[in-house]
Amino acid sequence: MHDDPQQLELLRVARIGRAQGLKGEVTVRLYTDDPEWRFEPDSVLYSQDGETEYIVEGSRTFKDRWILKLEGVDDRNAAEALNGVELYGEVDDAEDMLEADEWYPKDLIGLEARLVEGNGLGLPAGQVVGKVVDVVDSPAQSLLKIRLTEPVVTGQNSKGEDVVEKTALVPFVEALVPDIDLEEQYLTLDPPGGLIPGCGMI
């Protein structure tokens, strides 16, 4: 047990999913871009409040999924009991977070969303799309909720009234969100046509 869990600065790195096999292994959904480092043998992971420690006994990948073996979790029943548990890793300082390409959701909220240079839509680099107002969990990956700079009329409803979109959800993956600059308070987007109302729609 850590001496003072309340003083830990923790970063969410994974959520435990289903049990894998019969020997206590679990699948995990990643929230980190550096799982090789986070899941090294003997690495310590924590519950959200820092009160519970999970020691990594081993890790591997299978069909693009990460699978963990945690100390003391030695059979399928024990593994299944952890389904849904979120794992947090200790952060030394903000510089380490930036070097590891890891962020707290609160760090992303408020960032200006701009189109990346050479974006697939052929629109000007740096064009402001909106501002990040939330980070939403989904079964596949986290989503950035972006409040659009200008609301967009996307059609009409059955009553003939305009349907106005004020926000967009963008999967938080490197292919769509290639750059994040916390110092300058912006991130860049490379969305496909139709993902963001008003950007690349015909």
Curated annotation (Swiss-Prot):
Quote the SUPFAM superfamilies the UniProt record gives.
Answer: PRC-barrel domain (SSF50346), Translation proteins (SSF50447)
Keyword check for Endoplasmic reticulum, yes or no.
no
| One GO process term, biological-process aspect | ribosomal small subunit biogenesis
Q: Which UniProt keywords apply?
A: Chaperone, Cytoplasm, Ribosome biogenesis, rRNA processing
Gene Ontology CC: one annotated term? ribosome
Per UniProt, subunit arrangement is:
Binds ribosomal protein uS19.
Question: Which GO MF terms are attached to this record?
Answer: ribosome binding
Query: What family is this protein classified in?
Result: Belongs to the RimM family.
Subcellular localization(s) per the UniProt record: Cytoplasm
Outline the extent of the PRC barrel domain: 100-195
So what does this one do?
A: An accessory protein needed during the final step in the assembly of 30S ribosomal subunit, possibly for assembly of the head region. Essential for efficient processing of 16S rRNA. May be needed both before and after RbfA during the maturation of 16S rRNA. It has affinity for free ribosomal 30S subunits but not for 70S ribosomes.
Pfam families xref list: PRC_RimM (PF24986), RimM (PF01782)
Q: Which domain of life is it from?
A: Bacteria
Q: What is known of its domains?
A: The PRC barrel domain binds ribosomal protein uS19.
> What is this protein's name?
Ribosome maturation factor RimM
Q: Which organism is it from?
A: Bifidobacterium longum (strain NCC 2705)
Recorded hits in InterPro entries, A to Z, give: PRC_barrel-like_sf (IPR011033), PRC_RimM (IPR056792), RimM (IPR011961), RimM_N (IPR002676), RimM_N_sf (IPR036976), Transl_B-barrel_sf (IPR009000)
